[in-house]
């Protein structure tokens, strides 16, 4: 694992810190392509940019919560409404054996940690909440804790990473809408708590963007792959950190032409240069991506892809998928209306394309995917 200082994201950090200085008013969705650095950005802010004397952060990473329980919850949610309620408990609360008041637990925990991984709740209190089996009691309990934090002179912040993992569960009238309604209450109505939701699922962001109940109640912060200028600076930064030298302009341009501004791919390339040749590293990455794309297209000869659009199941032809991908041979980003919705939904779900709902455009998930498209089609 390469350990290094955080790089750039000056504008995004400035924007988020500016939001935190004002009273809570909107739900903020921090979104962008896979591995563009969303979680790294929010961790940098939590760990190094916030005054612990002013803020109490609840950082809930659904990747950790659902890694072993997602399938189990999915099945139980389909079977009974009760487990929808239990899922919210599972997501938002952190159980403690201690019988101290939650605010006392919070005081002791934030001395040693920059953030908390859930709403700290004594075991006996949690058992009482579970007996009542209503989200109303859950949200009332959380609100009371947040108000206690405000009375202590601190500003609470709730951050949920990979929120779409709940959004995928289209059960009981969309469980996630109960959370949205509550977050609107915390921000727009009570001005009590800042709420940030992180997601790399652009279809989920599109659903949020088009949701009438959230109009004028949410805003968006895009954490995209680096542009070329920033990517080249990042390559300089990494090569000095990892290789103790600068790369030539020719080598930097070559790296960018293969992987673009995807931070994780640039890190991967520079890390391997300690013991491998640059062209070999880049060619292996590209060949791997080409192989994945060919395999994806080959599978379409044996399966009939389907997507759900407004409760209608739409079947997609291989020919339509190929025609859509060919549009990117000469262009990295295109207007969304150039591709039938069912086709782009399928390609986004497969992490081949990324959707920008606010721009109304699509692009490959990375330069590497783009290069594979140009060579295969």
Curated annotation (Swiss-Prot):
GO molecular function: ATP binding; ATP hydrolysis activity
Binding site for ATP: 32-39
UniProt superkingdom: Archaea
The entry's keywords: ATP-binding, Nucleotide-binding
Coiled-coil spans in chain: none
Classification via InterPro entries: AAA+_ATPase, Archaeal_ATPase_domain, ATPase_dom, MJ1010-like_2nd, P-loop_NTPase, WH-like_DNA-bd_sf
Entry's family note: Belongs to the archaeal ATPase family.
Entry protein name: Uncharacterized ATP-binding protein MJ1010
Protein's organism: Methanocaldococcus jannaschii (strain ATCC 43067 / DSM 2661 / JAL-1 / JCM 10045 / NBRC 100440) (Methanococcus jannaschii)
């Amino acid at each position: 694992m390469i350990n290094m200082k955080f790089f750039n994201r000056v504008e995004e950090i400035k924007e988020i810190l500016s939001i935190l200085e004002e009273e809570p008013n909107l739900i903020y969705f921090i979104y962008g392509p896979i591995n563009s650095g969303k979680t790294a950005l929010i961790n940098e802010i939590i760990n190094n940019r916030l005054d612990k004397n002013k803020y109490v952060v609840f950082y809930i990473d659904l990747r950790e919560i659902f890694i072993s329980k997602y399938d189990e919850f999915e099945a139980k949610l389909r079977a009974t409404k009760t487990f929808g309620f239990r899922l919210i408990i599972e997501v938002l609360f952190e159980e403690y054996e201690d019988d101290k008041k939650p605010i006392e637990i919070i005081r002791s925990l934030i001395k040693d940690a920059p953030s908390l991984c859930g709403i700290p709740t004594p075991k006996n209190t949690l058992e009482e909440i579970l007996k009542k089996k209503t989200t109303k009691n859950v949200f009332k309990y959380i609100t009371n804790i947040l108000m206690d934090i405000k009375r202590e002179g601190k500003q609470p912040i709730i951050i949920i990473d990979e929120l779409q993992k709940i959004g995928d569960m289209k059960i009981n009238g969309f469980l996630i809408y109960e959370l949205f309604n509550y977050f609107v209450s915390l921000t727009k109505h009570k001005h009590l708590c800042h709420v940030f939701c992180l997601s790399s699922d652009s279809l989920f962001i599109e659903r949020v963007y088009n949701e009438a109940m959230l109009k004028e109640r949410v805003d968006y912060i895009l954490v995209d792959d680096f542009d070329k200028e920033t990517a080249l600076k990042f390559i300089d930064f990494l090569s000095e950190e990892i290789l103790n030298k600068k790369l030539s302009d020719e080598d930097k341009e070559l790296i960018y032409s293969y992987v673009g501004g995807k931070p994780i791919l640039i890190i991967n390339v520079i890390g391997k240069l300690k013991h491998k040749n640059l062209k070999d590293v880049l060619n292996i990455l590209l060949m791997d991506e080409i192989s994945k794309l060919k395999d994806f297209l080959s599978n379409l000869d044996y399966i009939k892809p389907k997507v759900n659009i407004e409760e209608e199941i739409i079947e997609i032809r291989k020919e339509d998928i190929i025609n859509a991908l060919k549009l990117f041979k000469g262009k990295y980003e295109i207007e969304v209306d150039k591709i039938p919705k069912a086709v782009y939904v399928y390609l986004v779900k497969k992490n081949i394309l990324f959707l920008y709902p606010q721009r109304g455009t699509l692009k490959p998930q990375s330069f590497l995917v783009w290069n594979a498209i140009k060579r295969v089609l």
